[in-house]
Amino acid sequence: MPSGSGVTPPATASSGSAVAPPAAASGPLNVLLVTIDSLRADVPWLGYARPIAPNLTRLAESSVVYTRAYSVSSYTAKSLAAVVSGRYPSTLYRDARFFTRYADSNRFVPELLHEHGVRSFAWHSHLYFGRNSGLEQGFDTWKLVPGIHFDPETDNDVTSDKMTALGIELLSDPKQTGGRFFGWAHYMDPHDQYHAHPEAPAFGKRARDRYDQEIWFADHWLGKLLEWAADKPWWANTVLIVTADHGEAFGEHGMYKHAFELWDVLTHVPLLVHGPGMAPRRIEERRSAIDLAPTIVELLGVTPPPDFQGKSLVPELRGAAPDAREPILLELSEDTHNPPRRALLEGHYKLIDFGRGHFELFDLAADPAESTDVGPRQPAELARLKALLASKYEGLPTVAPFGGQKLHDGGRANGPRGPGEK
């Protein structure tokens, strides 16, 4: 259930659905990934009462819906890097700026796909994506919508309409969609500032109400893109993945917006997958965005490489029983603004490492709002999960950031820029 929604999720469709599954593919598959900024898991198909996303809600009826999906991190520069690299951000060569720059010594998904004849293109609506972030690495085409402005504190632009227009332009180009392709669109509008939209339902005037209007607005324009795409010759062989880079806080834990921490409202996100031969159902097992890169490349006929740190979802998308994948790891690798944070989800427990020896343990079954640290009352469980978290990170090739910037908790970013450097 979405954090803080206070409503009961709808019945699952795993035992049957009135919506027919998409027909089987008639040729090689394409993948279209849509990420929506700041979209927490309070959405109608997961039980949220407001009709904030009617188009995606209809899409969910014919999709594989994950009810407990998690982003890897709680802000864009780190979470999306995991999606396009298949690796935890702390294992990527990167600088220490908040708007992280990734070194070209990393290998991202489009580079792997290019080796196998798959074209990659992307379109975006924030200037972070146009300032040599490194996320563009390997894409054959990388575009930004016109008329946007860079503000390091927020996003003042309204761009979902422009995103859909640019998407139609790219997807209409036979150079992009004439063969196998991987397309990626990142819709920004739910990110603060929360603009009012007169055409949207009048949810109210509070920040949360305007945020819900922003989601409705993004959904409205994404719906137009999907309606346009539905009769295109490539659509029948295209897998659509819709998710978010992170969630958003509205006063929980004294927080607003996102980044800086790893609370559930910041990391529990929607995830739905719609594609040929994928019967609609709901999967309740926890899943991580670290699994998206191996899923994308396998759908495109490419074997996930051994350095990917997640596991493909393809078998369960095609009907296999979901396997156990816990613990789920969450992280904020330290930079100029973010303190170091790590977290682990296993069963009904969540452990957060706040750094400097400070850990807190939450029993999510009894306390989904993560309000009470049960570590002092359950020292054995605390010790077990601390050891498990440590063992998981001992198995990851983490690297310090480079660039010389002063880090949030002190020290300097003097890490390597690539393999073999110190």
PLM segments and residue spans:
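Catalytic domains that recognize anionic headgroups
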Residues: 1-422
